[in-house]
Amino acid sequence: MHQPGSHQIQPIDSLTPFLGGKWWIRARVADKSDIRTWNKPTSQGKLFSFTLIDESAAIRATVFNDAVDTFEPLVVNGQVYYFSGGQVKNANRRFSNVNNDYELTFDRASEVILARQDSSAAALPMQRYNFVPIELLKQREVGSLVDVLGVVLKVDEISSITQKSTGRELIKRNVKIGDMSAAVEVTFWNDEAKAWNYPVGTVVALRQLKVGSFDGVTLSSTYQTKIDVNPADLPDVKKLATWYVSTGGANVVSLSSQGLGAGGGGGGEGNRGRKYLDEIQSEGIGRGAKPEYVDVRCVPIYFKQDAQWYDACPTCNKKVTEEGAQGDRFRCEKCDATVVPTQRYLVSIQVTDNVSQVWLTLFNEAGVEFFGMEASELKRRAQEDPLYIAKLAQARMNRPVVMRLRVKEETNANAMTGEESDRLRMSVVRISEFMPVAGTTEETRRRLAQNLRSECDDILRCIEAYV
């Protein structure tokens, strides 16, 4: 089959549904997906998709049914081809974040020809990204697809969950990705979760991640997700690497503890900003239907040294019960299995901001940030040195920190009487930094004076009531 002449070639950015006559494009293939099938009462079929890139733009293309058998063996990632006979239609943003208002579908009448891999073909871009700064993810609609460029800040171990709708076990791995604006948690599934081997400090370009809103802004891999490690042709890669080397990724706010606005566009609902501890009560924070998040600058003054962790099932993280008399056998009721447990943090800690004092709960991730090690490592050191936790407490107490708190009012029933009562629960979702001890600020002095005047007014009112 003859290759079309250069005068017949259209740039991708000129394709519209109203383009008449036969057209050709020359483009590089990227992001080729596996073949996917569907079988519904009303229809059945198969498809695969890929992105086409030339000097002008990129466009998403999908091949359906019989054409799959023709196109799929021919189309290879990275190669340059001529395409013709596709239908140009409005893009479906649910399935693509390619920066184009249109997309292509190919059928049996479409044509594909391998182009000569000459210098002009080599000049075509290998990839086109549509990166979103992490801080701006909170403005994106839940369910939309995004590209993100960032540094790996934290890699969790593999875990598994059971999909409620199908009963299937799914493998997952959470990875924290950050740039100079913010950080976000990305969940990778199944093969991608197992294959992840990029250490902390690696710069990664992630394509086609889905925006979620589980306990804040989160991202999740899809069947279209692609990972490009340390892509040298992107100008911001060196800048990100330098930023990480100089800062270690510290002091970036994690969006994965901040709620999305309505429809994903509000960008701030659920996040109440910096507060004093007494303002959490006085402003009714956390009293609504959804949890709210606040940042507080405070000083840890005490934590219960007799219980920092619990023995957990390595699969579901639920608490396990001891079975063997020697303390070497544990059972997970949820998984209905005997397991070798791991340890996870569950710590009660008291903090003050020089105005108020409250008790907070540290779950596992916040516990790792606070103690500087995994719970299993803390247990090992405590067993080797009975005074280790006391020494650690001395090192960690009375040092100012900035904590992000999850605040939610919960209703509990008294086990003896059955009476219900409301209680405001506050847990730590992030400890952003340990800061050097500083003198009392002017703002803190103002707040202390304000509270003192308020207490004096209360005393005077009590006196007047009895005079």
Curated annotation (Swiss-Prot):
<keyword id="KW-0479">Metal-binding</keyword>
<dbReference type="GO" id="GO:0005662">
    <property type="term" value="C:DNA replication factor A complex"/>
</dbReference>
<dbReference type="Pfam" id="PF08646">
    <property type="entry name" value="Rep_fac-A_C"/>
</dbReference>
<dbReference type="GO" id="GO:0006281">
    <property type="term" value="P:DNA repair"/>
</dbReference>
<dbReference type="Pfam" id="PF01336">
    <property type="entry name" value="tRNA_anti-codon"/>
</dbReference>
<dbReference type="GO" id="GO:0005634">
    <property type="term" value="C:nucleus"/>
</dbReference>
<keyword id="KW-0862">Zinc</keyword>
<dbReference type="Pfam" id="PF16900">
    <property type="entry name" value="REPA_OB_2"/>
</dbReference>
<feature type="zinc finger region" description="C4-type">
    <location>
        <begin position="313"/>
        <end position="335"/>
    </location>
</feature>
<feature type="DNA-binding region" description="OB">
    <location>
        <begin position="23"/>
        <end position="105"/>
    </location>
</feature>
<dbReference type="InterPro" id="IPR012340">
    <property type="entry name" value="NA-bd_OB-fold"/>
</dbReference>
<dbReference type="GO" id="GO:0006310">
    <property type="term" value="P:DNA recombination"/>
</dbReference>
<dbReference type="InterPro" id="IPR031657">
    <property type="entry name" value="REPA_OB_2"/>
</dbReference>
<protein>
    <recommendedName>
        <fullName>Replication factor A 51 kDa subunit</fullName>
    </recommendedName>
</protein>
<dbReference type="InterPro" id="IPR013955">
    <property type="entry name" value="Rep_factor-A_C"/>
</dbReference>
<keyword id="KW-0539">Nucleus</keyword>
<dbReference type="InterPro" id="IPR004591">
    <property type="entry name" value="Rfa1"/>
</dbReference>
<comment type="subunit">
    <text>Component of the heterotrimeric canonical replication protein A complex (RPA).</text>
</comment>
<comment type="similarity">
    <text>Belongs to the replication factor A protein 1 family.</text>
</comment>
<dbReference type="InterPro" id="IPR047192">
    <property type="entry name" value="Euk_RPA1_DBD_C"/>
</dbReference>
<keyword id="KW-0238">DNA-binding</keyword>
<keyword id="KW-0235">DNA replication</keyword>
<keyword id="KW-0863">Zinc-finger</keyword>
<dbReference type="GO" id="GO:0006260">
    <property type="term" value="P:DNA replication"/>
</dbReference>
<dbReference type="GO" id="GO:0008270">
    <property type="term" value="F:zinc ion binding"/>
</dbReference>
<dbReference type="GO" id="GO:0003697">
    <property type="term" value="F:single-stranded DNA binding"/>
</dbReference>
<dbReference type="InterPro" id="IPR004365">
    <property type="entry name" value="NA-bd_OB_tRNA"/>
</dbReference>
<comment type="function">
    <text>As part of the heterotrimeric replication protein A complex (RPA/RP-A), binds and stabilizes single-stranded DNA intermediates, that form during DNA replication or upon DNA stress. It prevents their reannealing and in parallel, recruits and activates different proteins and complexes involved in DNA metabolism. Thereby, it plays an essential role both in DNA replication and the cellular response to DNA damage.</text>
</comment>
